[in-house]
């Protein structure tokens, strides 16, 4: 209410909006009760555009709401008490990762990763850095990458620009002796390790917090003194006939280099119970493919 009052004081048209957060449950639109609502945000008209604001999240950018607010129906507190929709289907998290792996002059395998997470993942990373520091984030990245990989030179672009997504950059080096066989997972810690949809059946709708589009690209040199012994197969899996989701897994060789691409796109956030098995099997396949490895064998 204070934010709404401040905007009105500056002659900006604004009104409070009441809603029910995702954990609080849905609002019954036919017979709404005040007890069904548990959260308040502000709706302002800026240059003819409707802008939602929430003063409770200091790291939340302009015109953004916390993910917990996207729970379908909300109600504007004005003369008409009109109903508006805050649907998770309108929230898109887009993540891009590019990885480059090359052979160093001494024969070591080194690389760099450049990543732009989605907006809300960027916000979570900012909170982690604020609470625990950049060094702890580096330690967490090392843990995700694996004990046989050393991570250095972490850079965070746009850390203090809360309206922007983060830019995450770091270098890495594969440690260890040159074994006769090298097992290399091209996802380098970015893959899905387990399926979030574990239950065999579900009686309630699936309500994800956003739609998603995650693209991961890797370009690597074949390690010096090695040849490719085994390589995963490329494939494309569609979520359904309406093409509301797709999983691409593409890998190819050209000369002494390997190109790899993984893309997961889910075009809507809400699914009915009879669609649960489809969604679960889709991510089962993602987990399976993301675990596959390239096998390099030392030249004889």
Question: Residue locations for each model-derived region?
Answer:
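A sensor for short, sequence-defined functional sites
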Residues: 1-300
């Amino acid at each position: 209410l204070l934010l709404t009052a401040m905007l009105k004081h500056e002659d900006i048209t604004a009104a409070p909006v009441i809603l029910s957060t995702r954990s609080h449950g849905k609002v019954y639109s036919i017979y709404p009760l005040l007890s069904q609502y548990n959260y308040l945000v502000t709706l302002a008209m800026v240059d003819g555009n409707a802008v939602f604001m929430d003063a409770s999240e200091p790291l939340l950018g302009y015109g953004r709401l916390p993910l917990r607010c996207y729970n379908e129906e909300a109600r504007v507190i004005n003369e008409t008490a009109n109903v508006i929709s805050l649907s998770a289907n309108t929230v898109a998290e887009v993540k891009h990762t590019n990885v480059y792996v090359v052979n160093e002059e001494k024969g070591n395998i080194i690389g760099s990763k450049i990543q732009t997470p989605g907006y809300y993942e960027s916000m979570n990373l900012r909170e982690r850095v604020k609470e625990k520091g950049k060094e702890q984030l580096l330690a967490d990245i090392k843990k995700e990458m694996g004990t046989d990989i050393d991570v250095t030179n972490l850079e965070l672009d746009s850390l203090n620009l809360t309206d922007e997504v983060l830019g995450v950059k770091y270098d890495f080096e594969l440690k260890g002796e040159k074994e006769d066989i090298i097992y290399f997972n091209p996802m380098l810690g970015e893959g899905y390790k387990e399926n979030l949809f574990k239950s065999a059946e579900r009686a309630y709708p699936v309500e994800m917090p956003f739609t998603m589009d995650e693209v991961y690209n890797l370009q690597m040199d074949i390690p010096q003194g090695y040849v490719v012994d085994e390589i995963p197969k490329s494939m494309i899996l569609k979520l359904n006939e309406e093409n509301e989701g797709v999983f691409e897994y593409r890998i190819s060789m050209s000369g002494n280099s390997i190109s790899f691409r993984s893309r997961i796109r889910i075009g809507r956030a809400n699914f009915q119970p009879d669609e649960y098995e489809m969604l679960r099997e889709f991510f089962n396949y993602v987990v399976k493919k993301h675990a596959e490895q390239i096998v390099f064998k030392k030249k004889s």
